[in-house]
Amino acid sequence: MWYLAFLLIIGAYAADHAWETGNEYHYLIESRTLTVLDKLSQQFSGIVIKGGLTIQVKSPDTLQAVVSKTQYAPVHKTLENWNDEIADLKFDELSMSGKSFEIKLKHGVIRDVLIDQDVLTWEVNLIKSIVSQLQVDLQGENVIASSDNQIPDDSQPFGVYKAMEDSVGGKCEVLYSITPVPENFDSIPFPNLRKDGLNFFVTKTKNYNKCEQQMAYHSGITDKMNWKLGSNDGVLSRSSTSSIIISGNVKHFTIQSSLTTSEIFVRSKLHDTYSSAVYDSVKLTLDRMNQISNPMSASNNLVSTGNLVYIYNNPFSNQRKLRQPSVSLNSMEARSSENSNEENRSDDDRSNFLSNSGEEREYLQSKPTLNEAPESPLLPYFIGYKGESIQKSEDITSVAARFIAQIAWNLETSPVNAFNFSPSTEYIEPCIILIRLIRTMNVEQIAELENKLSDPIYHLQGNKLPTEYKKSYDKTTWDIFFNAVVSAGTGPALISIKNMIKNGQLKDTQAAMIISKIPKTALTPTSEYVNKFFELITDEQVTKQRFLNTSALLAFAELVRYTQSNRSIHYPVHSFGHMVSKQDNALLETYIPYMANQLTEAIKDGDSRRIQTYIMALGNFGHPKVLSVFEPYLEGTLPASTFQRLMMVVSLNRLSENFPRLARSVAFKIYMNIMEAYELRCAAVYVVMKTNPPLVMLQRMAEFTNQDQDRHVNSVIKTNIDALANLEQPEFQDLAAKARIARELLNPHIDTESYSQGFLFKKIIPSLNMAEITILQIIGSQDTTVPKSSYLNIYQSYGGFNLPPSRMSYEISSFRALLDMWYEMPWMIENETQKKLIIEETIEKLGIKGEDPVQFEGNIFVNTLYSSQFSPLDNNTIEETINAFKRIISSWQRSSKNFTSENINYLHYYDMTVAFPTESGLPFIYTLTVPKLLRINIGGGHKGSKTEHFKELTAAGYIMVHEKVQSRIGFVTPFEHRHYVAGIDTNTRLVTPLGLSISVNTTEENKKFKLTLQPSKYIRYGTGHSTVHFSVVPYTARNNILDLEHDFSKQDNDTLPVHTKEPHEIHFYISNWMFVAKSDLIDSKASEKQGMEAIKETVNLFCNSRGAYYRRFDGLMYFGEVRIRASYDFAKLDSDSSEATIPTIVNKEPDSEERKKQFLKEVGKNMNSAYGYVFDMSIDQGFDVQVFTLAYSYSQIDHKSQALFYWNVQSVDDPKIYAELGAIGYVKSKSISLNPEKALEQIPNDEFKAEIRLGNNFNEEMIKLEGNWTRTDDVKDMAMKSEIVKKCRQDMKQGNILLPACQKANKLINQKDLLMMSIDTTSDILYASANRGILWIQSLISENYVETMNLRSSSKNTIDMEIKMLPDNDDAKISLRTSQADVSFSLKDIIGNDSNVSMKDTFKEQLDDESVCVLDKTHAVTFDGKVYPLKLGKCWHVMMTIYPKRDPNNFEKTLSIPSDMRAIVMAQEMDDGSKQIKMILGDQEVHLQKSGDCLEASVDGETANFSDHKSHQEKDFEIYGSNETITVFSPTYEITVEYDGEHILLMISDNYLNAVRGLCGNYDTQPNNDFIIPENCILTKAEEFAATYAMTQESCQGPAPENKRKAEQSTCMSRSYRPSDVISDREAGRSSTKNRGWGYH
């Protein structure tokens, strides 16, 4: 209290402070504001203002003042420093009113400025910037009480204290520092004014982080933005310092000079050269002081302007809004900054930044209405005409109409303009201006613009087009208009879009796309705006349109999330206040209940597409209230499919963005329920990981992987924790540290391959100022290798400004259900007979029940920077798609269609804007604009034949993509309608033609295809040329805001590129491609390079981190007509013991049947029981023809594959051959025994050999390669010492050789570690290159690691290579030698010790478990790896069978079994301990048995003859023997069985995932449910489970009958999931009712 009393006392003595009544003060004004790319160049653009300020002191609390003789001069030149003296300035008169104004004081501190009502707003703010220099508080009037304050007095003229002080830049905390001026300081205008006092320095430093009043405009800022508006630090930062010299004492003084300098920076976090700045200063210097001799006349029209803070203009009126005088607290009422400053709040309390006394403040702009454009302050088009909207200058609807016509014309002629290598036609800049113009329009003006689009006067160029093109031009015109209006984002734009939908102008997919942009572009979505949008989405005109009704719901929910869940983040609340009042309960009372009711109705109707849409919409709200809607479905009290519940869990991601603790709590409880569906648990883990979970939770999840048996969930946890532990960004280090601690608790044996996984990728492109984090989350399937769900999230930032994230995802209930629907299509079952299949009879005997069908549900979601699309799918969708496809195919077969063409046009737009007043009174503005223009021209036609197997399809068109990233910093001078800019534009444009014609002619004997690329007859629909343009253009500019229609392709003195050096060009050509590169970084010497050197220089220029330096790249590529013919054939090959060679080609012409037959015969040589394929293709480019022929053969019995290849280039007109190449090669593996002990004695070996010949008739050059990939004793010795082999030998004592330990042991002892390869060649070039390579390696390696070898054994032109892997040392020894050079080194010598390459990991990965089923001596192993004891007895047991499923559309009907999956494998045990196998493949039966010491096979009762060199071949399978084993291999059914009489190894493809039953389990990747029996429930005892698959109806001896009776009496567990209570009463938003009796109370 003593401190406050002291301030009150000293304030009473300070009557005049800086102003002595009756005096007149004359100050000189100097002001400058400049913008620059300060880290790239010192090329400035800006303005200098000078003038005079006269002040007459009327009374202690009133000053009369006038600003006069003001002049300004533009600056656009290079300076050493921004505050240097600038020569050669040309000043023009700055037309200010010259009217006097009053300054109101309280205790010497300025409280208000009264200015004539007729003075324009821009002049008021300039006056305030000048008067702000006189705000000096030496008596603590605005002091912020603090124990750190040092109060100055006359005896101690030193002071340090903080005050809450207003200036034109805002009312913010200011740190005062007062010190005496040194005696030798000579820059004081009138040093004698100090009289008996002193000269003082007063320094004021403004803290923009703590402000009570900030004037600003912002839009497009994401909720992830890591800086606060107008702060002193961060990506966009500002600082301000005032230096004031006063004379006298702290109570009575004269202000001699006052200088305020301010700096605003945009600092890139990625590359300094992308940084930019705005510097400004305002200086007042005392020129003279005297008694008042000519009193100023006072205006009778003075009104308060509030205080010194910048005031907003009314863009659409020349009348200023009346302001109330500032009611500031004096020192008696001073508040502590620690307790009161609202700007010192928590970041989480974002919605409370406005005054505690009320949501709205008097100085804010009026709330926008729906019919009128918002009164957006500070923006060029709203203040650019003397402080008012540019609408005052001309008819902007006519300008906008001309822009639309120009853009449409540019798009229509874009293929022609593609040839222009001069400064390219500017497509994007007119779009940017058009959108910003529409933002200034009201509803009537947008309607007027719409009407003008039909006026021919605006389409003088377009009207000259032929009728066909005119129709396309008109469509393009309207497409641009629709997209531009929605991109404007204002209330009038919303009303206009609504009207267009209501009257049918916008409909179907185009309307859906347009409406999805509304939440992305909305600028001022007030309660009225949101409610009008709600009326639109519930209107029948929307709800009845298929695509629109989905898009509208999601767009609305997204908008509501931005306006209510993130109230102060996205929109200009510093200009208008909160868009939606805190008292607005429409979200809770109307919007969410409406969606919830619609979801209930959709579930009652069983309409999956509607259900999915409303789940997505509810999730998009991101509000806790949604939990109460999802609660009964997630907890199982109301019915919903697993897929629908999965969508609800995924939707928690939106909730986690604003309520991370709440979302984490619910998700963690879902994850912890091990009886829940694995898909939901995986999705819940992903949600938890997004919320920065506490360490104890991460540790719990990691530790639980040691108990949890769900492989998908464990894989998700492991991959996510690993990804988080590797995060490097500073903001994520806390999370990364926790993940690294938790990682130590993970189960070390988690298998992630083929299971659900999470990935995180980081990419930084400093040269483009872009950074990107990509998160890919996958939920695997149990019935296919294709993931069931995949979520791709892309987070991009530009130098530190985060762009709205993009998301792409798909979700599907079951790919198997989709396949089942495909198999039920008429063309898949049209040849079926009514005869009951053998497999069906077997299934009936077992009594296998069909599973309850999984209804097919799915969706595709794409959410980009610009728009979003959601496509829900169900059975009906697939049927509709298939029926549409059938209609198209049918129409192709019945008739032909002439070629027609259509255009698809998209204009996408995103911008981020930050604007606030500078201390010089001029509006600062930073914009990041990312527009994209996409044009797709596509046309097609078709022909068909009813009598022949002939079809032809033609398509042609082009794609044009133009994207710009425009970063601009600068300020606006309303009085001269100029926007001073320092900017960097990154432009990308691609125009490429698309043209092809396909004809297909297929018969049983021959299959031929003809493909023509860029067919010349359709060249007019494309161009035949492709162009690419990329540029980074830094520049400074002095843009005339009113000159809207200037020629963008021409440079003038108002726009100057920033060149650090004189730019030079590089030209180079590649065939029909021409390229030009131009840059500051290309010097005169580099510009002379050609060919490969020029290409290297260009690649270096654009691929390395080059920052914002000027560079440009243009490419022109010509694509002529290319005709491609192709054919293929297949044959079973006769055995021929001779060696295959490159033959003398019988016919070298394209499409030769003779050559194909020759190749099939040749490629089958030296192979037994081989199958062969041949593929032939010719490519006719007009000037030459290239011929390719490839033949391939394989033999299962030989474990050998062989290929023969031929290529030539020949003349189009005659058979002259220009070039020719032939190659042949094979790879052969050695068969290894199933028995590990026998395999130990064998040496695994892969033998390979290849020969290549070049030149006409192959007589020029030859290359021969042969080698082996084998095992050394090192691997054998290592294996024998391993625990795996020891465990295997224990299993083998019981007669088991195929249990998991022995499978791994077999792999371990068969690992190959030695590669030996030799190359013989006649090519001197290749041989010389090899020698140079060896010498280069020698130069890389220290002499200590190089060993010289004896090379006497190497012959001329032979290259030998040997690689010996050293897994124990995690290394490899490599030897290279020729007759001229040799080197031996280790792999680590080259790649270093820090490389990710690991020999240990490579060998370890080879031991991963495979999905095989085993019947061993005493145990069995399921496909999913479950091991259990098994005794079959002499009774057939089903190892594996496919089984029918119920039709999801008709539960009484059973789906047919796909023809390529009709397979059963059965086994029984004989009295001698051997086993027999019975296989049913389609309608054939295969029997395998052991007879004495021999293995026998029969097919349909007939003995199958085979040997080690010949297989028994059937249409769909073959039988062969090797290493005392019979193998049945069926590529048709994708089944392989290996049998040695006592042990059975069964392998099937992923096509059988979750589609089988039997002793081998259900093959769903989860071992814990493998004991599923025919009744579709799960037993716990192995013997009972096995007995349920015994064919007890037939002759059956052994334990099976008795065990089957026990199984019928045992408890069989249901396979259904068991949801739990995961949402508490409190989380659901209601008072607690559950668990009231819990605990002792």
Swiss-Prot record:
This protein's UniProt keywords: Disulfide bond, Glycoprotein, Secreted, Signal, Storage protein
Domain VWFD: 1410-1597
Positions annotated as glycosylated: N344, N549, N566, N831, N875, N898, N1001, N1053, N1268, N1393, N1396, N1505, N1523
GO MF annotations in UniProt: lipid transporter activity; nutrient reservoir activity
Biased composition (Polar residues): 322-334
Positions of region (Disordered): 322-372, 1594-1641
Matches recorded under SMART domains: DUF1943, LPD_N, VWD
Organism superkingdom: Eukaryota
Signal sequence extent: 1-18
GO CC, any one term: extracellular region
Occurrences of domain Vitellogenin (ranges): 19-790
InterPro entries per the UniProt record, alphabetical: Lipid_transp_b-sht_shell (IPR015819), Lipovitellin_superhlx_dom (IPR011030), Vitellinogen_b-sht_N (IPR015816), Vitellinogen_open_b-sht (IPR015255), Vitellogenin/Apolipophorin (IPR050733), Vitellogenin_N (IPR001747), VWF_type-D (IPR001846)
PROSITE patterns: VITELLOGENIN, VWFD
SUPFAM superfamilies membership: Lipovitellin-phosvitin complex, beta-sheet shell regions (SSF56968), Lipovitellin-phosvitin complex, superhelical domain (SSF48431)
Disulfide cysteine pairs (residue numbers): C172-C211, C1435-C1596
Tissue expression from the record: Hemolymph.
Bias (Basic and acidic residues) ranges: 342-351
Compartments it resides in: Secreted
Task performed by this protein: Precursor of the egg-yolk proteins that are sources of nutrients during embryonic development.
Protein name per its UniProtKB record: Vitellogenin-1
